[in-house]
Regions:
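Short glycine-rich, Thr/Ser-proximal phosphate-binding strand/loop in the N-terminal lobe
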Residues: 26-62, 66-69, 140-141, 145
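Short beta-strand-loop/turn "lid" adjacent to the catalytic site in phosphate-handling enzymes
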Residues: 46, 53-56, 71-105, 133-141
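Gly/Thr-rich phosphate-binding beta-strand-loop-beta motif of the actin/hexokinase/Hsp70
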Residues: 23-45, 118-135
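Phosphate/pyrophosphate-binding loops at sites that engage ATP/ADP/AMP, CoA/4′-phosphopantetheine
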Residues: 67-80, 219-231
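A short acidic Gly-Thr/Ser loop motif
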Residues: 31-35, 86-87, 124-128, 151, ...
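Glycine-rich phosphate-binding loops at beta-strand->alpha-helix junctions
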Residues: 88, 224-254
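Glycine-rich phosphate-binding loop plus the immediately following alpha-helix
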Residues: 60, 137-178
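Adenine-nucleotide phosphate-binding core of ATP-dependent small-molecule kinases
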Residues: 190-222
């Protein structure tokens, strides 16, 4: 059942060529992560026709069905060839007998195709984080362990502590004035750092920026482990559109 990206592309092309005799064939990409489900529908020229994502709250099949319904509502009945990726996708792929592409393979292939100048990719997921180095055709991946410190779940926990969400945390962080040291390796340790600061009157703006800085520190120390982040850097994953990417960029080298 495990497929490489090349195998998936070859099977998709073969299937699509066969189906083109009757109708157009579209590709459906499904990414099932630890906290969200993402789908994208592309035509035979790699143009996006539909894309969306939702948090699944452990209801993966129901969430996927909802997203597929939205796609059908927009595009109508179409012939598709699906491929599944993501940390939570293998079981569903086996159950549905759908090709599965390991997420690092999928990410690396996508970047080498659509952003070939990428030297380093930093991806923060719901419960995992990874750095991918592209060096002379070689791909080196570094991933966090079993702890979700410094990931999207960590940001959600910290946002809840400040009675907001990740987007609200981002808005607060835009106006920070001071930065505090907060541990990101563990949500429990981070809470013990933040609660005294709250009691002492630290602003939500400063705490929010400090939380994002903690994520950066965890990425640098826990994943890069001293290896330089230089050149063209791609930021991937749900948490990175918020302030963390802006704080992280100064750590990369030209």
């Amino acid at each position: 059942m495990f497929q490489t990206e090349d195998n998936c592309e070859e099977k998709a092309a073969t299937r699509c060529r066969r189906d083109m005799t009757m109708n157009k064939c579209y590709r459906l990409g499904i990414d099932i992560g630890s906290t969200t489900v993402k789908i994208a529908v592309l035509d035979d020229e790699n143009h996006f026709l539909f894309s969306d994502y939702e948090r699944h709250f452990a209801n993966i099949q129901e969430t996927l069905a909802d997203l597929l319904t939205k796609a059908v509502d927009k595009l109508g009945p179409i012939d598709i060839y699906p491929v599944i990726t993501g940390s939570g996708g293998l079981t569903l792929a086996q159950y549905l007998d759908v090709p599965f592409a390991q997420e690092v393979v999928a990410v690396a292939e996508a970047l080498q195709t659509y952003a070939p100048q990428t030297d380093v990719a930093i991806e923060l997921g719901g419960e995992d984080a990874k750095i991918i180095y592209f060096e002379g055709g070689n791909v080196e991946q570094r991933m966090n362990g079993i702890c979700a410190g410094g990931t999207g779940s960590f940001i959600d926990q910290m946002a809840s502590l400040l009675q907001t969400d990740a987007t609200g945390l981002n808005e607060y962080a835009k106006n920070y004035k001071s930065m505090y040291s907060i541990a990101a390796r563990c949500g429990v340790f981070a809470k013990t750092d933040i609660q005294p600061l709250i009691n002492e009157g630290a602003t939500k703006e400063d705490l929010s920026a400090s939380i994002f800085q903690a994520v950066v520190n965890q990425t640098i120390s826990g994943l890069a482990c001293g290896k330089p982040i230089r050149g063209h850097v791609a930021f991937l994953g749900g948490p990175l559109p918020v302030r963390a990417s802006g704080v992280l960029y100064p750590y990369s080298e030209p």
